[in-house]
Amino acid sequence: MRRTTALMAVVCLCLLSLNAYAQKKKPTPTPTPSPVEQDDVVRISTELVQTDVMVFDKDGKFVSGLKPEEFELLVDNKPQPINFFESVVTGGKAEERMLRAAGGKKSSQPVEGESTSEVGRTVLFFVNDLHLEPGSIARTNKTISNFIDNMLGPNDQAAITSASGQIGFLQQLTNNPAVLKAALERIKIVPGATPDSQRPYISPYAAYLIVERHDRDLFNAFVDQTLKANSMRDPDDRPIASSMVEQRTRTMLVLSDAAVKNALSSLVNLMRSTSKLPGRKLVFFISDGFMPNLTGSDFTTMMDRATGIANRSSVVIYSIDARGLSTDSMFDASSNGGFDPSGIMQSRLSGERTFMQEPLHALAADTGGRALLNSNDLAGGIARALDETSRYYLLGWRPENDAQRASNFSKIKVTIAGRPDLKVQLRRGYLGAPPEKSKATAQPTSVETTDVLGVTESSSEELRAAVALGYKRTSGANMQLTSTAQVSAQSPGDNGGAIVVNVLGAVYDSNGKAVGSFRQRVEVTRTRANEPPVYTNVNHQVDLPPGLYQVRVIAAERGTNHLTGVMDWIEIPKVKEGAFSISSLFVGEITQAGGAAQIGVNASRRFARSSRLRFTTNIYNAATPVQLGLQIKILRGKQVVLTPPEITVGPDKISNPANSPYTLEFPLSALSPGNYILELTVTDRTKKVSASQQLSLTVY
């Protein structure tokens, strides 16, 4: 699993244990800042602010190879020198360092083998299920499912979130397709999301025109349709119908405003959570559109808050109208009182779609994205957005006054000199907010948790954790989940020695219910920056039924506020008793240290090219006499780069056909540095059935 500085918080038992541990610590006294320290704090006011820019030609293709002197930056309509310039690949190995450099910040310590790391993209789907019709939900599910199957890269991190929160515990970043599909299955019609089920149907836009724009002609048209729909033929019934329409329209606006507030509040929380994630993030905001500003509503404030936090968090929003080219239900006679011979309803409501799409335009434009509207090719829109945002130019410039330092400052214009044919796409604002002038000393780092994505930041760059998950059969169809938490520590200087670390872990099912936990205090050897890490392992096993599970681990250095964490998912399949199958791959590394082979579990899945990969799987219910074929494949992305000859395994190698471990070794010297997928397929030639397992690994 990819390790980033953005980590999943350990909750429930883990956080309770950690809080108890923290309460035992004595508070650290705040030292009096020296003049040098005070100068350092004040000096950060001269840091650069960052503007990310995408440049496209007339065909919508990204224009690469531009030089800094070709960019013209205007701030407050005044030319501004560009102090930092870089062409960036989204999710590339250097993106986070470039973002820090553009802000004038010191680069964090590079992790071991970082030069070969392929980080991948961060993609989030915000499904505004409070404003989705049933047909739109079906299209949304199909579109996101296509992304999972065909567009999710091996190094990407993705999450599916919703305005209603109905996804629950599965609303988390992951690279596991099973988790994403399970989250997608939870997107259903939200009860009460369609505020009007009576006839004739009155949309929020129609209610807006009647109540706030005082459109009497439209009001009377709905009164006429109400009379028809309810077979009210007596002239004395008209006041009753008028009262019904008036009450329905006012109720409609109240409910619509509440739904909009809830949706934007969920979006704000998501944007806050993404601030803990490194690099630039792409968010797809999927909705049928919704009502913009109403009288007395704080719509504008909430929109500004959402886009402001998005800009500070390096988020680009691409909004998608899930309706595609479908016909509005307002013009469906089956959902109304009947045909409107006056034509008033069709005339007045013809601008509804455009009006409801205004927030989609605003969210995208303010964050440097685009609104993908009026198209049935939703999957194609997502593919184009992924391509458009895959590269960008990062400009750093120095603000001249406090107004320009404000994160919501938007008087920024970028053009390409002498190239009016090129389109420059940028956000209204900039990436992040420069630190404010302050003479206060830095306080010890604390850990903050959020409800969205479960993201928190590590408080230590020296302390690192990894976790490897697997499953195997215990007896019959029963399964055991195995966890190996691996902790290492790096000295910020030349000091070695050892530290004491509390390792806490918890196992959760797909509903967030704790089904297992572990805690252990270990001693971790601290290595110098130029030395390979020394790992300390903590193992845990728990018997569980088939299902989707998450293991979260947090490691806290005793006596300090250094803390780090990691999480991963695993799906334990449901296998019939007696069926041919294999367990997970349990992987280790063989290195040459001190002239002797050293073998150990490698939870980080990072391997030196000079080492050999050793992995074990358990083979279950092979036919007798045993005739198995074992095929290894090495993939980079979705492309096979290496296929060693198939290995034949006979009865002499399998002592127990019902349950027998089998170990293989594979030299890594033939692989160039990078990220790979190891795939093992075991074929029972007698039964003519196969079983496969995969694991990701990084070679450096």
What are these regions (language model features)?
Residues M8-S17:
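Bacterial N-terminal signal peptides
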Residues Y21-Y700:
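Scaffold/interface architecture of coatomer-like assemblies
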